[in-house]
Amino acid sequence: AKSPADGYTILFAYSGTHSVNRSIYSSMPFQESDFAPIIWTAAVPQILVVHPSLPVKNVKELIAVAKSRPNQLVYGSTGSGAINHLAGELFKMMSNTQMVHVPYKGGGPVSIALLSGEVSILFAEPATIVQHIKGNKVRALAVTTPKHSLAMPELPTVAESGLPGYEVT
């Protein structure tokens, strides 16, 4: 934010540093207006996955179990304010369910927590979770995008699986 606006300094950033952090931290070393966006390069889907011990096969069943067991299901995230944390909060709000959020310090720790059953639910990026889905270590329920994911085209979207209007990228 301190470089001259001459086009020689470019920052490749994501929504966490430029929109979410402002709502989490009382002060930031920059203002959003210090930057001029030039392109949106990607929209990364999240895959809604569950530990195999959770007796659900789709989004409708997950919502039903969550409603029958308020504050008993635990979902993990890569940290407070991360995209998968916000995906979980939106899911809770739109489905009118109560689940417990546990933030971890990154993708590795939260993936281990899901694989071990420490958390039952995770919204995960395909790059970190597809191998575990294919290895039958976790169960994929849906993708958070409005269209099917190229990484796993057989998965339905959350919106078409029981939560109309749900979209996170």
Enumerate the language-model features and the residues they cover.
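Short, charged, surface-exposed secondary-structure boundary motifs
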Residues: 110-113, 150-154
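Conserved helix-loop-beta element of the AMP-binding
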Residues: 36, 62, 137-150, 166-167
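Short helices/loops that flank or line small-molecule/ion binding pockets
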Residues: 1-5, 90, 94, 108-118, ...
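Hinge/capping helix and adjacent helix->loop/strand transition within the periplasmic-binding protein
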Residues: 2-9, 15, 22-109, 158-163, ...
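Paired acidic/hydrophobic, glycine-rich loop segments that form the ligand-binding mouth/hinge
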Residues: 6-13, 120-124, 140-142
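Short secondary-structure boundary segments
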Residues: 14-15, 52, 125-127, 145-146
